[in-house]
């Protein structure tokens, strides 16, 4: 026991007396056993610490140590009372014998009475202070020690040495400070966030697996209520990742959601593939663990490629900041992939949120949001959307565009029971499908504007020169003009719900799309119609009868893979179809052009490794038709083609076009019965179709400039002279829509939106007089992809009006014109 030095001297000096007193005390006790002994350390005795003796200092007044350990007030006692306390503390037996034989001094009794009065006054003051502290509790947090450290009024404080008392007091302070910090955080959260809604939605089946997930994740979200929760947790887990001896990482709301989604997917896969259920069950834990990090790894790799190794942050945590409104500048950060706005005071979300189309995670939980904007449906990359504990009553139909959404948190909202029950029974994906199949909330767009062009290519303003458009409508059928359409109609075998998840199921049905395609094609009354992705059976059984009723005849050629199929399966293969009005054009010749067959049948194309591995396994084709324009006698060659789709094979597309242009020179010589290069250059020709190439690709450059070399699309490839010397052609070609800088897009989807369809024409003999303009911008801003309720294909049609510059025509060929369409799929070119 550690005793101060001045007390040690006192104890050592009184050791002999202490032993004598103990012997005397035993004798007295034996001789006076019948006499009652006064209690030692009873109530009001000076031998113990008084419960009412507390320091009257600032700490006590502020209530920081309320209900805590009470300290003895030795500084307020007179010297004689201090001596009595010391004797009782260090010599209890001696003090006990004196208490039996000697009465207390009257002065000491008077002092004790005064002391009791002071203690009563202090009790009253302390009660008043407690009332004031309760009123100021939010401003000045209190420290409440654990129950084991608190004492009642009548309880005696056990005697402990000073150093043990000091250690206990320090432990009490540490526990009190820790509890104070927790109370401060709770009070701060209560001040910043609105009252939580802990009542669940009254659904029909609250025990369903999907609704249990809602409640579990909602509770986890409610617990994540500290400011910058996600940022703090990310930083903590990052530190744990660097330390191999650290604890297991804490699971966040996002991680828990990923685990739940992975488990559900595993169950669905096991049901669809019962034979592999055992193996899937064995790998379940591994798969779940991988799924937690797969998205992060893929995103990091994608961002590295996007930023070329530069660091770019893509997550923003504004949770628990008491935000009432959001600045419009926030939505200029269109690179954001995760945005956390939970535990704020937001009452609405601005419609400008649709600019954040890279968002994958959005947390709006624990706010005061009354309505979700329909523009949020444009954030089609969202995978996790948390709306827990708000005032949302319904969801907009545009949420059907959230094709990647894996989980939608709606617990804690007074939401429509129809929506809540659907989520509880079938989950988030079925809810999105239900909303997608509802009637579209936006109306049909206005018709695409028809644009007239001057001879120099300038667009005629319909406001300043309305007569030009009136005359064009009245005199549309002039002798030296013709109109043509190029349209990828989307083969019905490609129009699946898996491929076009953003399209309502009823809008993908072939019956609906077929009627809409027929209406759109016949609406423009084009003299010549070139279609791509037309099924073989559909051409013969649908398009030929329909088009014949409006004065058209047609020719068709399907893709080369049909040669390896049975007769029934080959009818499902798509190809290119060309329809022409018999009163405008006379068909002179038709040729089926197979890119791979032409390449293999000619010695001028070097058979390289890239040719066999990348080019030969593609079955793309072109349909070549040679017409006589009846009014003028002009011979015009039309090429209708569909190139390979994959952007990873841009070199293959370039080679396909290079071979096509190379062979067209020979074909033109044959049709025109001439070997003159100048005559071939000035011949009338139109090449249209789906080229699956943008303006930046080598295909566009080859058409527009006549040559391409050292392009990134061809880098590292070997195609003989084409890559050694570059691609070249002698035709003078121009894009019909080059007069308007090309359309903003000819195909639109969540993954890709751009112009990839073109109409190329020979400038020496033809000029553009009219174009079908772009789709209404307001309408397209609310669409994430075609087809939809108003557009039956994933492409839009291109319509152009051409004028033949020269009158008359070349001499007709000696062979008899072929009026009968050739429906055979074999190539007419001998190789």
UniProtKB/Swiss-Prot annotation:
LRR repeats by residue range: 311-333, 335-356, 358-379, 381-402, 404-426
Subcellular location: Cytoplasm; Nucleus
Gene3D superfamilies, per database record: Endonuclease/exonuclease/phosphatase, Ribonuclease Inhibitor
Annotated binding of Mg(2+), by residue: 533
Underlying gene: CCR4
Cofactor(s) demanded: Mg(2+)
GO terms (BP aspect): DNA replication; DNA replication checkpoint signaling; nuclear-transcribed mRNA poly(A) tail shortening; positive regulation of transcription elongation by RNA polymerase II; transcription elongation by RNA polymerase II; traversing start control point of mitotic cell cycle
Principal cellular location given in the protein's record: cytoplasm
InterPro entries: CCR4/nocturin_mRNA_transcr (IPR050410), Endo/exonu/phosph_ase_sf (IPR036691), Endo/exonuclease/phosphatase (IPR005135), Leu-rich_rpt (IPR001611), Leu-rich_rpt_4 (IPR025875), Leu-rich_rpt_typical-subtyp (IPR003591), LRR_dom_sf (IPR032675)
Pfam families assigned to the protein according to its UniProt record, in alphabetical order: Exo_endo_phos (PF03372), LRR_1 (PF00560), LRR_4 (PF12799)
Organism superkingdom: Eukaryota
First-tier enzyme category under EC: hydrolase
EC number per UniProt: 3.1.13.4
Cellular component annotations (GO), alphabetically ordered: CCR4-NOT core complex; Cdc73/Paf1 complex; P-body
Region Disordered, residue ranges: 29-50, 142-163, 806-831
Name of the protein: CCR4-Not complex 3'-5'-exoribonuclease subunit Ccr4
Comp. bias intervals (Basic and acidic residues): 811-823
GO MF entry, a single one: metal ion binding
UniProt function note: Acts as a catalytic component of the CCR4-NOT core complex, which in the nucleus seems to be a general transcription factor, and in the cytoplasm the major mRNA deadenylase involved in mRNA turnover. Ccr4 has 3'-5' RNase activity with a strong preference for polyadenylated substrates and also low exonuclease activity towards single-stranded DNA.
Keyword match Membrane: no
UniProtKB keywords: Cytoplasm, Exonuclease, Hydrolase, Leucine-rich repeat, Magnesium, Metal-binding, Nuclease, Nucleus, Repeat, RNA-binding, Transcription, Transcription regulation
Protein family: Belongs to the CCR4/nocturin family.
Catalytic activity: Exonucleolytic cleavage of poly(A) to 5'-AMP
